[in-house]
């Protein structure tokens, strides 16, 4: 049995610190190359956040090529018995997107370090500069559709009583006053709750303690299918993570996000 098996999805520095030597642990740092070089959690392997995305217009947030994912997870030493702990330094956007990737490859043994590197540092935990070597070459992966919503799927679900579209962008993008695509505004019926509003800056960017009640009041509830997006499914990595951490049973990331929806000729929008 894993030493992580009794822990919730979201863990604290005090949970991780005594488990850093666990043989099943793959610790993933999604900060930046510069931040990682300055000091990271001991044993952490750096993943450039850009490697979690397709990176090409018009929808850079789509999944990377399967071969690129197989190379990435080979470097990390992916194996069925592994437990991932994932962190970043921005409150959970990139870490949440990586957790979405783990769901896509069908691997569900994972945790998010609440608050990420800022919380680890605030708790006076140790940092290291040692860089672990890549473990191996490409590994064959099976990609699963369930964690993802395509544009066509989202469009087919619009208006359903059991759907909540969680728009993680800022209010000006949602309202259409800030335009980052051919079309401005939002997906019809979408609920706007900006990703950073779910973080507590007084607690080193940890997920705010009342997030379940906030989402309930907004109508983003566990009885609905929650499809979350932003511009490139980076910010909505955090909102995907939050819904998963709260135990919502039907959560999907719309990886195309507004960069796809807002540039497609056949998508409806509201302002």
Curated annotation (Swiss-Prot):
| Induction profile | Is constitutively expressed during the entire growth cycle. Expression increases during exponential growth to attain a maximum level at the onset of the stationary phase, slightly decreasing thereafter.
Any one Gene Ontology molecular-function term assigned to this protein's record:
thiosulfate-cyanide sulfurtransferase activity
Location in the cell reads: Cytoplasm
Q: Which UniProt keywords apply?
A: Cytoplasm, Detoxification, Repeat, Transferase
> Practical use of this protein?
Microbial rhodaneses may contribute to cyanide detoxification in natural environments.
Give the coiled coil ranges. Answer: none
Q: Which InterPro entries match?
A: Rhodanese-like_dom (IPR001763), Rhodanese-like_dom_sf (IPR036873), Thiosulfate_sulfurtransferase (IPR051126), Thiosulphate_STrfase_CS (IPR001307)
Q: What happens when the gene is disrupted?
A: The growth of a rhdA-deletion mutant is impaired under cyanogenic conditions and fully restored upon complementation with rhdA. When P.aeruginosa cultures are treated with exogenous cyanide, only minor differences in viability between the rhdA-deletion mutant and the wild-type are observed.
This entry's Enzyme Commission designation comes to: 2.8.1.1
Entry's PROSITE patterns? RHODANESE_1, RHODANESE_2, RHODANESE_3
Q: Which domain of life is it from?
A: Bacteria
The chain positions of domain Rhodanese read 21-129, 159-270
Q: How does activity depend on temperature?
A: Optimum temperature is 20-32 degrees Celsius.
GO BP annotation list: response to toxic substance
Q: Which reaction does it catalyse?
A: thiosulfate + hydrogen cyanide = thiocyanate + sulfite + 2 H(+)
Q: Name one GO cellular component term.
A: cytoplasm
Instruction: List the active site.
Output: 230
Name the CDD domains for this protein.
Answer: TST_Repeat_1, TST_Repeat_2
Record function comment: Catalyzes the sulfur transfer reaction from thiosulfate to cyanide, thus converting cyanide to the less toxic thiocyanate. Contributes to P.aeruginosa survival under cyanogenic conditions, and thus provides the bacterium with a defense mechanism against endogenous cyanide toxicity. Is the main cytoplasmic rhodanese in P.aeruginosa, accounting for 90% of total rhodanese activity.
Q: Which PANTHER family match?
A: THIOSULFATE SULFURTRANSFERASE
Q: What is this protein called?
A: Thiosulfate sulfurtransferase
Q: Which gene encodes it?
A: rhdA
């Amino acid at each position: 049995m894993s030493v992580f098996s009794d822990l919730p999805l979201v863990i604290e520095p005090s949970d991780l610190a005594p488990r850093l030597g666990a043989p099943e642990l793959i610790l993933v740092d999604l900060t930046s190359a510069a931040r990682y070089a300055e000091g990271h959690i001991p044993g952490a392997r750096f993943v450039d956040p850009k490697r979690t995305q397709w990176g090409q217009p018009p929808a850079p947030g789509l999944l990377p090529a399967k071969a690129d994912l197989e190379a990435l997870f080979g470097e990390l030493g992916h194996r069925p018995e592994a437990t991932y702990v994932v962190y970043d330094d921005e409150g959970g956007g990139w870490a949440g997107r990586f957790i979405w990737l783990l769901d896509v490859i069908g691997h569900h043994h994972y945790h998010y370090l609440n608050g990420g590197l800022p919380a680890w540092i605030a708790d006076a935990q140790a940092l290291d500069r040692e860089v672990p070597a890549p473990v191996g070459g490409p590994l064959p992966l099976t990609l699963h559709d369930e964690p993802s919503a395509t544009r066509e799927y989202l469009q087919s679900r619009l208006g359903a009583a059991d759907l909540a579209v969680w728009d993680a962008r800022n209010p000006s993008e949602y309202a259409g006053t800030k335009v980052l695509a051919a079309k401005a505004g939002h997906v019809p019926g979408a609920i706007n709750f900006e990703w950073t509003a779910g973080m507590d800056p007084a607690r080193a960017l940890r997920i705010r303690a009342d997030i379940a009640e906030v989402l309930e009041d907004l109508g983003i509830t566990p009885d609905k299918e929650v499809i979350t997006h932003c511009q490139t499914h980076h910010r909505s990595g955090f909102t995907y993570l939050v819904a998963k951490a709260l135990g919502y049973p039907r959560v999907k990331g719309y990886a195309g996000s507004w960069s796809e929806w807002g540039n497609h000729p056949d998508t409806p929008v509201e302002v």
